[in-house]
Amino acid sequence: MLSVREFSNISMIKGPLVYVQGVTDASYNELVEIEMPNGERRRGLVIDSQMGIAIVQVFEGTTGVSPTGTKIRMLGRGLEVKISEEMLGRIFNPLGDSLDNGPPVIKGEKRDINGSPLNPAAREYPEEFIQTGISAIDGLNALLRGQKLPIFSGSGLPANMLAAQIAKQATVRGEESNFAVVFAAIGARYDDALFFRKFFEETGAINRVAMIVSLANEPPVMKTLTPKTALTLAEYLAFEQDMHVLAILIDMTNYCEALREISAAREEVPGRGGYPGYMYTDLATIYERAGKVIGKKGSITQMPILTMPNDDITHPIPDLTGYITEGQIVLDRALYNKGIYPPINVLMSLSRLAKDGIGEGKTRDDHKDVSNQLFASYARAVDTRGLAAIIGEDSLSEVDRKYLLFGELFERKFVSQGFNENRSIETTLDIGWEILSVLPESELTNIKTQYIQKYHPNYRGKK
């Protein structure tokens, strides 16, 4: 660790950045203390150092910082936050300062928030089902313990509500007492941050949730620190306290916009869409901190949530996120306009690991077959809607009309559910069987006969 060094030669102040001359030994992400002439102290991080100039990103912003009379101290270490189990049920900013008028964290250990992605050789393959209580996720795009499964939303879609509902309901069945949620609100508007806080407090979910919050009006560096602090806490709870942790990061678009703002202030050559060329690497250092480690009981499951600008799934942020993570849950504006909550487009959604965490001994023996049949039948229902719009519903065959009915029931009964409705996987699969029963049995080609005879409403009623 480097010793503390003091400098006073500020060559330039630009946006959230301070340029300090005469620095030859600064480390990347080194913590800096800035003492102003009036005695006020601020903190920052070194984000670049070359040709004797260190660029410092100031946490509290540079308003009021004077080029003369200001002392810059390089502290010789990274940003460390005191981490503890006491943070569950509390709200903090990315620097570890309390935002709920509660006491500071007393017990715990200081940890550098710049953690590393998990070593691939140390990873254990995800195989255990996490029940979110959301049918469109549990039934068709299951989330597994240790998985990275993002939610792609659009502006004005109810991503906040869905994130809060998952944070309240998600659990590893049989290990409910050992489950915790680390909720990172990145660059949140004040009313959104207040919504999350009130929701968790009123539902009692706050007891197992630790909130790390940065607001929209804070400097960009605070937004880039938020997921790092949240994941440092998640790592401590998972790998030191043996807890199953769900890390929800909302909104990663704000994180990427902060990266772009800092990059522009540094006058870097922009990459695709004006975002820095290293954004893919930067996102990977966050997403790859999730997973299961061989020999450890705990795990980190990650659900990053992002807003697709102009609902464009090919935009750099969702595009790069999709490359790194293991699937995506896509919210759909057309479903939202039909009054369906959550408006999850199951045909565009995917969980790449789902097949390994469902079925006999994990959820229910018919889960895989029912999931495959629901996908296939809904895809045909959507195609049939397009056909009906051209030739008219009266020209459709009897079977095609039943697929139209199935599509409507699928959206209204299976995908749509109440904000406070927590469905077990058994309830989800039973609803799936109920709506599949409107189709002729001969159409259920993806389901084994033994499951049809065991779970189909026509047979269950005869037992």
From Swiss-Prot:
Membrane topology: Peripheral membrane protein
InterPro entries reported in the protein's UniProt record: ATP-synt_VA_C (IPR055190), ATPase_a/bsu_AS (IPR020003), ATPase_A1-cplx_bsu (IPR005724), ATPase_F1/V1/A1_a/bsu_N (IPR004100), ATPase_F1/V1/A1_a/bsu_nucl-bd (IPR000194), P-loop_NTPase (IPR027417), V-ATPase_su_B/beta (IPR022879)
Subcellular location: Cell membrane
Pfam families from the UniProt entry: ATP-synt_ab (PF00006), ATP-synt_ab_N (PF02874), ATP-synt_VA_C (PF22919)
One example of a Gene Ontology biological process annotation: proton motive force-driven plasma membrane ATP synthesis
Domain of life: Archaea
Record keywords, A-Z: ATP synthesis, Cell membrane, Hydrogen ion transport, Ion transport, Membrane, Transport
GO MF term set: ATP binding; proton-transporting ATP synthase activity, rotational mechanism; proton-transporting ATPase activity, rotational mechanism
Family matches, as PROSITE patterns: ATPASE_ALPHA_BETA
GO CC list: plasma membrane; proton-transporting two-sector ATPase complex, catalytic domain
Keyword Protein biosynthesis: no
Family indicated by similarity: Belongs to the ATPase alpha/beta chains family.
Cross-referenced HAMAP family: ATP_synth_B_arch
Self-association and partners: Has multiple subunits with at least A(3), B(3), C, D, E, F, H, I and proteolipid K(x).
Function: Component of the A-type ATP synthase that produces ATP from ADP in the presence of a proton gradient across the membrane. The B chain is a regulatory subunit.
Protein name: A-type ATP synthase subunit B
Organism the protein comes from: Saccharolobus solfataricus (strain ATCC 35092 / DSM 1617 / JCM 11322 / P2)
Gene name in the database record: atpB
